[in-house]
């Protein structure tokens, strides 16, 4: 039976990381179920949810990825995902969503804590956080 694996790659962002992962996975006949990435201050966090064909071992995949990514100074973590967990995740994609937009010239940790306290109070999970503004100039941060 096919299995599901979440591959999390992280480290200093550089060209070719996604290619290195994809090339490494190619020999296992893996299908990509989902993919996403974020880069904050040149630090990459890449997640790829994959379908592993029956007969392929998670340990072989992790070893291949670790070898490939060590060559480009990246790290990898592989997490098995149960079929039940995956099915629940897929079933939730059509559920209603709430969007919160936080508008401020300057955001303090207390602002983020106040907003997330409300989400916690109502049992809501944060699916995605996106910065809509430009990056803050560190030397001018107190002017905001």
Map each language-model feature to its residues.
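A conserved regulatory-domain signal marking ACT and ACT-like small-molecule sensing domains
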Residues: 1-144
């Amino acid at each position: 039976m096919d299995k599901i694996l979440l591959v999390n790659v992280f480290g200093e962002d550089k060209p070719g990381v996604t290619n290195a992962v994809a090339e490494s996975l190619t020999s296992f006949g893996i299908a990509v179920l989902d993919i996403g990435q974020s880069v904050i201050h040149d630090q990459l966090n890449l997640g790829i949810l994959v379908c592993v064909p029956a007969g392929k071992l998670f340990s072989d995949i992790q070893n291949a990825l670790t070898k490939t990514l060590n060559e480009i100074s990246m790290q990898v973590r592989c997490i098995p995902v149960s079929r039940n967990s995956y099915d629940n995740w897929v079933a939730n994609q059509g559920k209603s969503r709430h969007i919160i937009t936080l508008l401020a010239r300057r955001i303090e940790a207390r602002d983020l804590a106040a907003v997330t306290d409300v989400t916690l109070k109502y049992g809501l999970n944060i699916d995605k956080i996106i910065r809509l503004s430009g990056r803050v100039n560190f030397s001018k941060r107190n002017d905001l």
